[in-house]
Amino acid sequence: MPTTVDDVLEHGGEFHFFQKQMFFLLALLSATFAPIYVGIVFLGFTPDHRCRSPGVAELSLRCGWSPAEELNYTVPGPGPAGEASPRQCRRYEVDWNQSTFDCVDPLASLDTNRSRLPLGPCRDGWVYETPGSSIVTEFNLVCANSWMLDLFQSSVNVGFFIGSMSIGYIADRFGRKLCLLTTVLINAAAGVLMAISPTYTWMLIFRLIQGLVSKAGWLIGYILITEFVGRRYRRTVGIFYQVAYTVGLLVLAGVAYALPHWRWLQFTVSLPNFFFLLYYWCIPESPRWLISQNKNAEAMRIIKHIAKKNGKSLPASLQRLRLEEETGKKLNPSFLDLVRTPQIRKHTMILMYNWFTSSVLYQGLIMHMGLAGDNIYLDFFYSALVEFPAAFMIILTIDRIGRRYPWAASNMVAGAACLASVFIPGDLQWLKIIISCLGRMGITMAYEIVCLVNAELYPTFIRNLGVHICSSMCDIGGIITPFLVYRLTNIWLELPLMVFGVLGLVAGGLVLLLPETKGKALPETIEEAENMQRPRKNKEKMIYLQVQKLDIPLN
């Protein structure tokens, strides 16, 4: 019988010193993904702004106006509800360099009423109420150019989509280690180049390149750590690898507070990727990949190194390692296999919708917080903290209660929290923060559970394909989310939350249509996957009837 890596790790250590060392190193990689995934909150922060009008600054200085008086005297008031504010995107067509203006009410000297004064575009740029800078303030991504901020964030998600779709083949073809080192090098270079980009176009190009490699590198780190540990620890290290990403969120909030200028922030969060190049000497190639390439001797050498690091010794009977042979006819998976049969088709549609919804709500809530929050740094920090209890609740519930009910409940909590936030008055900001944190915790749980359940619902020969196809909807959601958030807030600040609420509640209801996978073996065939929903007693009754039918002709 073939000796597998899992068999050897039972003797050489499934999660001992070596695996803990690898987990720490790869967890650092996971943490540095946070600034790329949600850094738009700080990089693309849009402060209060108004049109710059030549002569206003000089008049304000001559008259000794306070900032509030300058706004009241020289800037149009807010527009009607549901319309973009003229204060931000329009200015009075007035020559403020005239010496006839009075300091008390300068516009009163004009013949026409203030409400009838002609308004024009911001030809001379904007004045931003912020001590720092962002890509919005530097490249004037406001008013007619505000869609360029949406495009900036969508570009990184386009990169995620392309990179994650191709990373499986690349990592299987060239190895995990080479692929990891290549992605971190490109990610580091693109991040630094983005920080010194002279124009919006160059910044957009480097952001797209970051998207192409950053999520791919994060996924390779996930693959590596799960391949280094024994089977009993894979789920746990997978969850804690995502917890490391949450630590990255907390660090990002602190760094962004210390560095309010986007170029320095981008440069600082990109530098650690150069450190990961040292992993060439720290992290070995995956033994499982080496075996798949028939490099058994090299795989055995690495496994002996793992055992030595763990203070273990391998029995002589386990000194030879062979790849398990697949029996039966080899099947070639295709997309049609995901929709050909009724139950698997239902699973595919629900999983795709849940991946999409998880991405939209997760990224959307963070982006909306950047627009609606009073203190962007504290709000971001508090909402990131709730991801820790989310991870521990998953660990406590999925093997006790199951996957389906916690998954459905987390989606519904996220959706209900979004809807509840809409109706909380602005003077109850503390309550709004608590409800928002509940929503963030709910969607974090949903996001992590869909990663787990996706693989458990598909038979072996289409499992990888099913995970890749369904999870690609996560990146599609990320592409759409910036346009959804930033465009809808121009209509009404709370409108995105209403959309998120409906999406989350529907996702929770659809999850209840899926079978429970707790305690069930992974399906090996289409038939097993199709029968997952059926109660066991019905299956036994069907088998009994079949036996009776077979007995009748023999009498």
UniProtKB/Swiss-Prot annotation:
Effect of P284A: Decreased TEA and metformin uptake. Decreased tyrosine phosphorylation
Extracellular side: 44-150, 199-208, 260-263, 370-375, 436-441, 486-494
Effect caused by changing K432Q: Lower Km value for MPP(+) and reduced Ki value for TBA inhibition of MPP; no change in transport efficiency (Vmax/Km) and clearance of cyclo(his-pro) and salsolinol
Effect of Y362F: Decreased TEA uptake and YES1-mediated tyrosine phosphorylation. Strong decrease in TEA uptake. Strong decrease in TEA uptake. Strong decrease in TEA and metformin uptake and YES1-mediated tyrosine phosphorylation
GO molecular function ontology, one term from the record: L-arginine transmembrane transporter activity
Effect of mutating Y73F: No change in TEA uptake
Expression induction: May be down-regulated in diabetic patients.
Glycosylated sites: N72
Sequence motif: Proline-rich sequence, positions: 284-288
Subcellular location: Basolateral cell membrane; Basal cell membrane; Apical cell membrane
Tissue specificity comment: Mainly expressed in kidney, in the cortex and medulla. Localized in testis, mostly to peritubular myoid cells and Leydig cells and also detected along the basal membrane of Sertoli cells. Expressed in brain, in neurons of the cerebral cortex and in various subcortical nuclei. In the brain, also detected in the dopaminergic regions of the substantia nigra. Expressed in tracheal and bronchial ciliated epithelium in the respiratory tract. Also detected in secretory phase endometrium, in scattered stromal cells. Expressed in spleen, placenta, small intestine and spinal cord.
Keywords: Cell membrane, Glycoprotein, Ion transport, Membrane, Phosphoprotein, Transmembrane, Transmembrane helix, Transport
InterPro entries: MFS_dom, MFS_sugar_transport-like, MFS_trans_sf, Orgcat_transp/SVOP, Sugar_transporter_CS
Catalytic activity: (R)-noradrenaline(out) = (R)-noradrenaline(in); (R)-adrenaline(out) = (R)-adrenaline(in); serotonin(out) = serotonin(in); dopamine(out) = dopamine(in)
Domain notes: Contains one proline-rich sequence (Pro-Glu-Ser-Pro-Arg) that may be involved in tyrosine-protein kinase YES1 binding and is required for the activation of substrate transport.
Other information: Mediates the renal secretion of many clinically used cationic drugs. Transports drugs such as diabetes treatment medicine metformin, 1-methyl-4-phenylpyridinium (MPP(+)), famotidine, ranitidine, amantadine, acriflavine, amiloride, memantine, cimetidine, platinum-based drugs cisplatin and oxaliplatin, 3'-azido-3'-deoxythymidine (AZT) and tetraethylammonium (TEA). Mediates the bidirectional transport of MPP(+). Metformin competitively inhibits OCT1-mediated thiamine uptake, leading to a decrease in hepatic steatosis.
Protein's recorded name: Solute carrier family 22 member 2
Gene name, Swiss-Prot/TrEMBL: SLC22A2
